[in-house]
Amino acid sequence: MPGARDQGAARARWLGIGLLGLFLLPVSLSLEVSVGKATTIYAVNGTEILLPCTFSSCFGFENLHFWWSYNSSDTYKILIDGTVKNEKSDPKVKLKDDDRITLEGSTKEKMNNISISLKNLEFSDTGKYTCHVKNPKENDFQHQATIFLQVVDKLEEVDNTVTLIILGVVGGVIGLLIFILLVKKFIAFIIKKTQEKKKECLVSSSGNDNTENGLPGSKAEEKAPTKV
């Protein structure tokens, strides 16, 4: 029947897509590249800056290929290009566009660090810096991460006035709560002591009343000694 044949073909097609997805999923999640948490970094003109980059692979790597690229509004270029033979080898640089660039990373001891430093910064160095990694052991799967560098004349001082005010208010509130708690405990202690004194006073007063009224157990009930 045509309907049953079409349904069978559709099932086979979806099964094939599912198997392909399961095959590609480990690859897509294995190789990762990171340039840190900060997506933008600032540096002063004329100084040196470290552009961080690390990678990780669940399947290991052999003859890993890495490179850094620079991209601005009107310029794109490869800054440095190199390879890493294996996990016991340090990266080797094959191409370097600028003498101001130095490879600072190491891949030994599972550091997987391919960071670079850029000396004598210029305002024209402002732009996007992307760290690329391609792993032949994972069917040449490639991953990259980008960080934006902003070269400035001087770093702006962060105004912490608001932060200090907030911390002062929070500290004051906490101090006030502690003070109130201590006062509350002190008052409770005084009340407890006062109640204990009142109780002792009532017991003592009750004993005196019994003595004066000649009640059982009082001194008035005691008989005088018999004269012989």
UniProtKB/Swiss-Prot annotation:
Annotated keywords: Cell membrane, Disulfide bond, Glycoprotein, Immunoglobulin domain, Ion transport, Membrane, Signal, Sodium, Sodium transport, Transmembrane, Transmembrane helix, Transport
Glycosylated residue positions: N45, N71, N113
Cysteine pairings via disulfide bonds: C53-C131
Topological relation to the membrane, as annotated: Single-pass type I membrane protein
Cellular component, GO annotation: intercalated disc; plasma membrane; voltage-gated sodium channel complex
Membership in a protein family: Belongs to the sodium channel auxiliary subunit SCN4B (TC 8.A.17) family.
Transmembrane recorded as keyword: yes
Transmembrane stretches, start-end: 163-183
Bias (Polar residues): 203-213
Extracellular side: 31-162
One Pfam family this sequence matches: V-set
UniProt signal peptide: 1-30
Domain of life the protein comes from: Eukaryota
GO BP: AV node cell action potential; cardiac conduction; cardiac muscle cell action potential involved in contraction; establishment of localization in cell; membrane depolarization during cardiac muscle cell action potential; neuronal action potential; positive regulation of sodium ion transport; regulation of heart rate by cardiac conduction
Segments of skewed composition (Basic and acidic residues): 219-228
Cytoplasmic side: 184-228
Organism for this UniProt entry: Bos taurus (Bovine)
Major localization listed first in the record, in broad terms: membrane
Single Gene Ontology MF annotation: sodium channel regulator activity
Subunit-level organization: A voltage-gated sodium (Nav) channel consists of an ion-conducting pore-forming alpha subunit functional on its own that is regulated by one or more beta subunits. The beta subunit SCN4B is disulfide-linked to the pore-forming alpha subunit. Interacts with SCN1A; regulatory subunit of SCN1A/Nav1.1. Interacts with SCN2A; regulatory subunit of SCN2A/Nav1.2.
Stretch list, region Disordered: 198-228
PTM note: Contains an interchain disulfide bond with SCN2A.
Keyword Nucleotide-binding: no
Protein name, UniProt field: Sodium channel regulatory subunit beta-4
